[in-house]
């Protein structure tokens, strides 16, 4: 919404060149009343933006007022702004030193969600300033009437009007410039948070050049000195950063060397029990030689027993070394447990195989059969054990009968001796 909607122009006929409002009168009044009661919601602001018509504002008209042959106040202000720059006038009008902090607090906000609320606050501030400037408008009307009585000056020279229309005068009568259609365009300095002090100082520098014959040199020298000091400070900071990086790298290298030294000390302090661990892994697995002759049976069994005894000794040594050795990590302990379990499992299988061989040798029918399966050996050994138990009971009965017969014979012999 343009800032001069509530203040129609009265001095010149530029009203027909103004861009028509984007909304209808009822909708505009509705949004005005709602914004005065409470700030609009973000969703309402967004949809209100999307309802705008895609028509750009018209360029401001350059023709003078029809009521007088002399250039009007707006034309004179346009010439002033062309010479001095329109940004300086807008910034000096909007961004004064008193309201600079207020403008920063209002305008520099989120443009997506709080744009319309900030614009409403800004419009309120501008309307208050325009109301204050209307009071001073009557005073400036006398000076502008004197300027209208004189012939128009060239745009290359500043229209001073005997010193009455200076930079302050442009600030005083800038409300008339805002009524120009070009004021509908938004000033970039209002939307974007540029440093305001720099822009104002840069805008006021041409006026100082006009008043003075020679430009000041102290500002340039001071700025060059400040730039040199900043460069020196940057160099010092870079050097400090490089030194800090070097210190960090040295510390990293020292920590790495310390880790290497600690690892070497720990490896040297650990006792070397690797051959014992290898012995556990290299337990001999003996298979029965089915092609061997029955004559080598006794020697084979004796050699197996000797090797089993040696394996038992090795396991005892491993257990003793574990008790004496320092505690290791969890991975090494798990590996040791797995290896000992494998060794014990192999030993159990070997003992079971030897027991099968011994049982087979006790069965007379399968004694010479080297390829007898384990199931047959177990079955025949059970039958043989049962038969041996029956033989034992039979022999016990026979011995009892023989003892009874012996007792009977002794009694008969005693009777014969007594009869003689």
Curated annotation (Swiss-Prot):
Q: Where is this motif: 9aaTAD?
A: 78-86
Q: What's written under domain?
A: The 9aaTAD motif is a transactivation domain present in a large number of yeast and animal transcription factors.
Report keywords, A-Z. Answer: Activator, DNA-binding, Nucleus, Transcription, Transcription regulation
Identify this protein by name.
Transcriptional regulator Myc-B
Domain bHLH intervals: 336-388
| Protein's job | Transcription factor that binds DNA in a non-specific manner, yet also specifically recognizes the core sequence 5'-CAC[GA]TG-3'. Activates the transcription of growth-related genes.
Could you describe the subunit structure of this protein?
Efficient DNA binding requires dimerization with another bHLH protein. Binds DNA as a heterodimer with MAX.
Query: Principal place where this protein is found?
Result: nucleus
Compositional bias (Low complexity) spans?
A: 143-160
Q: Which PANTHER family match?
A: MYC PROTO-ONCOGENE
What is the phylogenetic placement of the source species in the record?
A: Eukaryota, Metazoa, Chordata, Craniata, Vertebrata
Compositionally biased intervals (Polar residues): 161-172, 319-329
List the residue ranges of the region (Disordered): 141-181, 203-275, 319-345
Q: Where in the cell is it found?
A: Nucleus
Organism name = Xenopus laevis (African clawed frog)
Please list where the region (Leucine-zipper) is annotated.
395-416
- GO BP annotation list: positive regulation of cell population proliferation; regulation of transcription by RNA polymerase II
Q: Which PROSITE patterns match?
A: BHLH
Compositionally biased intervals (Basic and acidic residues): 249-262
